[in-house]
Structure formats: C-alpha cells, structure tokens
Amino acid sequence: MIDKKILRKQQIKLLSKNKSTTADEGIKLLDKLVETAEWKQSKSIATTISNLFEVPTKPIIEKALSDGKMVYLPKTMPHRQMAFLPFTNYEDLVVSDYGIPEPKYNEKLVNQEPDLVLVPGLAFAKDSNYRVGFGGGYYDRFLAKYSGKTIALVPSAMHFETADWEIGEYDIRIQKLIFV
C-alpha cells in the first residue's frame, strides 16, 4: 500500500517531467471522449482549467462550446465545497487561493447537476475506477451528492492497473475511465 500523500508527490514529480507526453495523449483522450455516448448526450459539461502537467482542458472546453454545450468550471467554496459556474471566457476568471483560475461566484448561476463531470486526479485504478485526487476532498464531497455522469481522462502516467493506495470511506468511484 502506498500512502496517498507520498503517491501525490511522486505523481506530481513524474507528471511534471512528462508534460509534453501528457499533452500529446490529451489529444487522443479528447478524440475518445467525444465518441462516448456520455459526451454526445450531454448538453452541459463540467471540467477544470488544467495546470501544466494535467491533460489540457482548453481543447475540451473549445470542443464543448463548438458542439453547443454549456461549460461549467468549479469555484472553491468554504468548508471544502465546490460550486460549478458557467464558463464565459478566460478573461473573466480569477485566480483562487490555490492558484487555479476560477469563475467569479454568482449564486444565481450555480449548476450542481451538469450532465457530465470530467473529474481530475493524479492516479486512476483501472480495475476499480478509484482515483487519487489532489488531497482537498473537494471532488469527493461534490460527487457524493451528484447524480449525473462522471468520466476521467487518464494519460499513461496516471494509469494504475489496481489501486495500490488505501480506499477511504469517502472516496467516490468514477463511472468511466478513458485510457490512451
């Protein structure tokens, strides 16, 4: 069993060394994503603004918008909660305390039930669909109340055959993992 804190550090180090590979694989993952029934049936998707070592989300956002879908981004809230707000353009985003671009909060625009949520993470287990996220618990808290579809795009550096880490009672399975 690998301690999640150690695994997170190892994964960030590995992913930071493999940014170009992950970016290249992101193109293939997007191609696979748009062929899924979940994507085709969704009128709204939620994703994040990726950091430099994650699968790039800008092409995903652009594809969703060109397909006529509403795009929602997470806004971190107190008590490790998230609210999903509409993406308008990159200039309207503000940098959070975590250094992540987020939409400005507007209670009237919150959508906690987008049709499809693309779930980020650092490690994904193929045999069980569990993930290791960034450690804040934001997505697990959100997903515990969410009833829509979930997908994670998994580049090779995040792909684990089995969960070599402890699965906690609050860890939530991702419905579908898409591998390179």
Describe the residue ranges of each PLM region:
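Short active-site oxyanion
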Residues: 69-70, 128-130
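Short, structured patches in soluble enzyme cores that scaffold and shape functional sites
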Residues: 75, 86, 102, 121, ...
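N-terminal active-site beta-alpha-beta segment that forms phosphate/nucleotide-binding
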Residues: 1-112
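Receiver (REC) domain switch-region micro-motif
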Residues: 45, 117-118
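Residue-level signal for inorganic ion chemistry
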Residues: 11, 71, 118, 135, ...
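Charged helix-capping and loop-helix junction motifs
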Residues: 61-62, 132-138
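Short glycine-rich anion-binding loops that position phosphate/pyrophosphate groups of nucleotides
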Residues: 51-53, 122-125
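Surface-exposed, charge/polar-rich loops and edge strands
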Residues: 2-6, 13-20, 112-117, 125-128, ...
